[in-house]
């Protein structure tokens, strides 16, 4: 588990990691031995048709967050055939499976998300969604099938494994239904990383770059995602006599403009942050001064420092404007997912695996973005390693983005993702096999 405030540490440029890696290639690296590597390749070739069929079945039968009943049943039934120690119903519908290696060592974990999105699929695929208005438009069907394939391969290598692997199939990454807990936070709360304690956790996510490429960086890679609601409480009056009221619409407009100064004037421009207003609701008729206006929006940041700094600045602006004009207000701020933080030491240790498998020209530098991902809760509990897997057909000039009704990942990414995860997990265990659980240097 990382210690200290990560906002005080600067993201390590990937170029420096790769430069250090290339400088070290002349010396022996702990890596999967050739015999095991060939075994992985052979098993992937043998099972890839089955894994793709699993992916297509999941794609045809998408389920929303905390409702992944059939997906979890399929995952559990497949894991049962592998002889793993399985916990069902973790965080509602999650599945956690433990593979105990034949040799002593620490425990590493790997996670895939299982939920779909409320989107009507428009791909026209022969295996398109059978559930109206629900689609796997973010690649979670791909992630789940890759992780099942990884469990299949590593189970066949049990005698070679130094330590343990925890496979985490997570519900509700896109968010739990209103009023329900869910996702990674609930999995952590219910002990998905315990018994035995996990020393490092890995995950991948589909991204519309070419198959054969991955995107990666140490440090912050995605932003936190918070929401806010501001209610301006004015006083109604006739539209022809505005001086007798307090116009909540005018004050709301002033607040929208003033909030933009939080990012442009109060935040370090080298530390990304966004304050966006998504909805404004107020007023009832054209000739009535609005008494109440509600604004809703999102705040996205990378660093913990900005996440702590911005909310009180926002409220001070709202309070000042409202008090100046004799209005009241209510400011509600709802923290969401934290930023995903790739542990720098773990990143430096494991980056060579990506380069050795793919070649340094295929390991692209990920530029941190203010999208959000609840893998961050796992990475707060134990060092995390998160990367993006290219799923675009290289023959096509462009591909539909995530969350598009046309999103259609190239299935050739599935065996490659399986191979990458197998090597990452085995390399991590090999490099930590002499370190007792709970005393990992990561």
Regions found by a protein language model. Give the residues of each.
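Bacterial N-terminal signal peptides that target proteins for export
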Residues: 1-17
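Bacterial N-terminal signal peptides
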Residues: 13-27
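Acidic/His- and Gly-rich active-site-bordering loop/insert found
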Residues: 32-136, 145-162
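Metal-dependent amide/peptide-bond hydrolase catalytic core
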Residues: 32-35, 81, 250-442
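Divalent metal-coordination and catalytic microenvironments
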Residues: 58, 97, 110, 140, ...
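Acidic-glycine-rich active-site phosphate/pyrophosphate-binding loop
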Residues: 111-126, 221-231, 391-397
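Histidine/acidic-residue-rich, glycine-tolerant segments that coordinate divalent metal ions
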Residues: 125-135, 142, 154, 159-279, ...
């Amino acid at each position: 588990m990382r210690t200290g405030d990560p906002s005080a540490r600067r993201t390590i440029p990937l170029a420096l990691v790769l430069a250090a890696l290339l400088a070290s290639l002349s010396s022996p690296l702990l890596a999967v031995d050739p015999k095991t590597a060939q075994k992985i390749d052979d098993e992937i070739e043998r099972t890839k048709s089955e894994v793709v069929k699993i992916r297509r079945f999941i794609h045809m039968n998408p389920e929303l967050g905390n409702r992944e009943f059939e997906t979890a049943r399929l995952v559990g039934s497949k894991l049962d055939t592998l002889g793993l120690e399985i916990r069902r119903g973790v965080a509602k519908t999650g599945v956690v499976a433990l593979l105990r290696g034949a040799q002593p060592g620490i425990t590493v974990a790997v996670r895939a998300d299982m939920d779909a999105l409320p989107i009507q699929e428009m791909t026209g695929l022969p295996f398109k969604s059978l559930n109206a208005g629900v689609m796997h438009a973010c690649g979670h069907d791909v992630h789940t099938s890759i992780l099942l394939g990884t469990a299949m391969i590593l189970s066949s290598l049990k005698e070679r494994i130094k330590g343990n692997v925890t496979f985490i199939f997570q519900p509700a990454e896109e968010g739990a239904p209103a009023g329900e807990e869910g996702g990674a936070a609930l999995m952590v709360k219910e002990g998905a990383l315990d018994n035995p304690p996990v020393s490092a956790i890995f995950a991948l996510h589909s991204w519309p770059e070419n198959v054969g490429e991955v995107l990666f960086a140490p440090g912050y890679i995605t932003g936190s995602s918070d929401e806010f609601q501001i209610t301006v409480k004015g006083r109604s009056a006739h539209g022809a006599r505005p001086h007798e009221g307090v116009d909540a619409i005018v004050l709301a407009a002033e607040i929208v403009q003033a909030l933009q100064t939080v990012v442009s004037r109060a935040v370090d421009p080298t530390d990304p942050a966004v304050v966006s207003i998504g909805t404004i609701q107020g007023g009832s008729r054209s000739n009535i001064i609005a008494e109440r206006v509600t604004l809703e929006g999102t705040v996205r940041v990378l660093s913990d420092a900005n996440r702590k700094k911005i909310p009180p600045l926002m409220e001070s602006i709202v309070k000042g404007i409202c008090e100046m004009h004799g209005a009241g207000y209510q400011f509600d701020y709802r923290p969401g997912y934290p930023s995903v933080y790739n542990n720098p030491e773990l990143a430096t240790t494991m980056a060579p695996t990506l380069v050795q498998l793919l070649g340094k020209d295929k390991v692209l530098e990920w530029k941190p973005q203010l999208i959000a991902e609840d893998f961050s809760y796992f990475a707060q509990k134990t060092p995390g390693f998160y990367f993006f897997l290219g799923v675009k057909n290289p023959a096509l000039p462009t591909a539909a983005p995530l969350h598009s009704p046309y999103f259609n990942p190239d299935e050739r990414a599935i065996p490659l993702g399986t191979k990458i995860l197998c090597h990452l997990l085995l390399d991590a265990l090999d490099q930590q096999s002499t370190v007792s659980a709970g005393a990992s240097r990561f």
